[in-house]
Amino acid sequence: MGLLYKGSKLLNTILDSLEDQEGGAMYISCDVSNGGPVEPETGYVPNNPLFGLALDSPQQECAASCVGCLSCQGSTALPISSLTSSDFDCGGCFDPTIGVGVGIGGGHIQISTTPPASSGNGSSNNGAGGGSSGNHGYWSTDEMASTFPGLPPLDIDPLPSLFPFSPCGASYNFAAGNPHQAASLSYTVHPHQMLISPNSHNHGQMHSQHQQHQHQQSQVQASHVGNSLLQSSGGNNIGSNGSAGGVANAASCYYETSAGTAAPPPPPAAAMYPSMSVNVSMNMTMHHGYGAGDAGGVPMQCSQMNWTPPSNSTSAAAAAAAVNVLYPPLLSPGHYPASATYSFTADFRAPAPTGLGALPPLTVGEKESPSPPANSSLAGYYPTGVGNQGYTPPHKSPTSYQAAALGLSLSAFEDEEDSNEDLDGDEGSSGGEMKPNLCRLCGKTYARPSTLKTHLRTHSGERPYRCPDCNKSFSQAANLTAHVRTHTGQKPFRCPICDRRFSQSSSVTTHMRTHSGERPYRCSSCKKSFSDSSTLTKHLRIHSGEKPYQCKLCLLRFSQSGNLNRHMRVHGNNNSSNGSNGATGVGGESSTGSGVGGGNSLLT
């Protein structure tokens, strides 16, 4: 009867502890075999006095064996730096108690024994086998059997805390089991303000949200927001990677259990401290049917995770020490028939050292005006009033000329300039993507802006180069040079095949196509092809009906200057003597055989 009474009293204590909830946090009370209440476990109570907040859970007076715990000292918050190592030693204040835990899978209540925390320096090993703990003084199965002779020793797997600072210095591993009653937890932690100070208190405000519960799976998403995260250099935990960890003995384990009601989010703190975004994902498989295990079979271990603040942080206190996250061990880590599986994934993102206020604002000119290219000669060049610099023209071959477009602009061409521009036409019209200099009047493209500028003179009628012998003017210096050779009879360019000589190099290029049979210039209307661009220009005038050459005597018009010259012989005039009675083009310049564009016709 005594055992049944104690068992019913224990169940009542468990049920009462489940009802003591306030502000989304669960208060867990403990009881010993003699009925004397003691201090709740600091590793499972969210409002821990070690973190600067008083316990609001219903408590009673401490047991007679207590030597001065935090409950005896009142609800005042004590600084971490003033606490000695004995404050973290559960053997000095906390009697061997029966800790009450709430199992997630299936809603079953499980009972676990709470081991005393070990203080001092410990070593962690993250290998598969795990390292041995520095303290093996946990309660054995015999001690539990003497306390509860009729109850088997049952354990609960503790939940991995987000940022606990456990005095346990070892690491532990979990054995995989069958996923029967599984629970999946997803934590997102955003401590926007993290103040690293060795002597400050930790004042945290938290809220949680309880999501879904379907069948035997529960998904809980809790959001923990802390205004400041305390770090103190209390003890050393040396990991297996050889790096000295941060403060493992600075505070006890900290947990939060989500409830139906959520506390309001904390007010935003000042933006002067560096922030940290933490994404934590945990998958758990828990079972309520534990069997008796041997406490000495598997060494007690604690898993450890390190996080180091960014070294380039602007805050002077931000580079104090690293953060060690330690998880509490299993109480009886024997080989259970049904074991627990933990999967932990953390993603730490440190912010940039500069805040939003320090970033220079972008001006309209910076966003809309890109920087000019280094080589400005590669960009499209157009004279004033002719083209647009921002326009990149497509490639236009000489075979795509339209008769309607040529009827508007080709009246300014003369036969000699057409023949002199054969080489330029070959460079521009047959070019590819590297020739963006486009004439918007006739569609020709050129590789250089200077060549386009010279070509535009044929449309504008500008003729800055004049012959000193016959006062003829030309738009290009090369045309004037070729014209002067007609007076001197000089023909320096020769065909290597037939030894025929020419006064212009472009004439040799055109002549060589007669030997090779190449006809790159094709009419878009009748599909006829020609060896030079000037012949194609004359042919297109047949389709367009353009006749730029007019006789001054009878006002007859002709499409080619050669036809006008033959017409002038009908009038009995000597076309070679002077240009007083000769034909005059639309441009009004008096010269023998000249068209609108001016210049003479070379007949070889």
Curated annotation (Swiss-Prot):
Highest taxon of the lineage: Eukaryota
Keyword Zinc on entry: yes
Biased composition (Acidic residues): 414-427
Keywords: DNA-binding, Metal-binding, Nucleus, Repeat, Sensory transduction, Transcription, Transcription regulation, Vision, Zinc, Zinc-finger
Main location: nucleus
One Pfam entry name: zf-C2H2
Entry's Gene Ontology molecular function annotations: DNA binding; DNA-binding transcription factor activity, RNA polymerase II-specific; RNA polymerase II cis-regulatory region sequence-specific DNA binding; zinc ion binding
Function, in words: Transcription factor required for gene expression specific to photoreceptor cells.
Compositional bias of kind Low complexity: 117-126, 200-237, 572-581
Gene3D superfamilies: Classic Zinc Finger (3.30.160.60)
Location relative to the cell: Nucleus
Entry annotated with the keyword rRNA-binding: no
Chain ranges of zinc fingers (C2H2-type): 437-459, 465-487, 493-515, 521-543, 549-571
Gly residues composition bias: residue spans: 582-604
Full protein name: Protein glass
One GO CC term on file: nucleus
Region described as Disordered: spans on this chain: 111-139, 199-237, 359-400, 414-434, 566-604
GO biological process: circadian temperature homeostasis; compound eye morphogenesis; compound eye photoreceptor cell differentiation; compound eye photoreceptor fate commitment; entrainment of circadian clock; entrainment of circadian clock by photoperiod; photoreceptor cell differentiation; positive regulation of transcription by RNA polymerase II
